[in-house]
Amino acid sequence: MVPVNPALPGRSYPPTPPYLVAREKIREFASAVFATNPISFDVEAARAAGHADLVGPPTFPIVVQEYTLQQLLADPEAGIDFSRVVHGDQRFTYTRAVVAGDQLTATMTVTSVKSLGAHSMVTAESMIVDAGGEHVVTAISTLVVRGDE
């Protein structure tokens, strides 16, 4: 088994293609995560709460971040065997809510690689911006790459 490349921290990947946040995508995601807030299902409720359209649940940006993680996992120089990856941690830092109609682009940078015995922990930050280049949310994921058993 090839170990995770310890030189990954600081490596950035190209911006993802724009992702159009559609109302139905928000509704589908909200249903899948058992969200109950009406601002994710009802446009009028979202507008009454001061939003332009439906609001994605707090974890919705993972949909956009997954495109950046695909870049990392497909990078042969990363040394990450996807069959050995488990999700260790997830955090989001918001500037504003994700709303239907947003066109979001993400750029990922690997921030750390730590070895824990035979295992590795890879932390990456995905900066997610709107069509105007304004920051919306930063998604931070830690992947655990299991070593040999």
Swiss-Prot record:
InterPro entries: FAS1-like_DH_region (IPR039569), HadA-like (IPR016709), HotDog_dom_sf (IPR029069). HAMAP family: UPF0336. Belongs to the UPF0336 family. This is UPF0336 protein Lxx02810. It comes from Leifsonia xyli subsp. xyli (strain CTCB07). The lineage of its organism: Bacteria, Bacillati, Actinomycetota, Actinomycetes, Micrococcales.
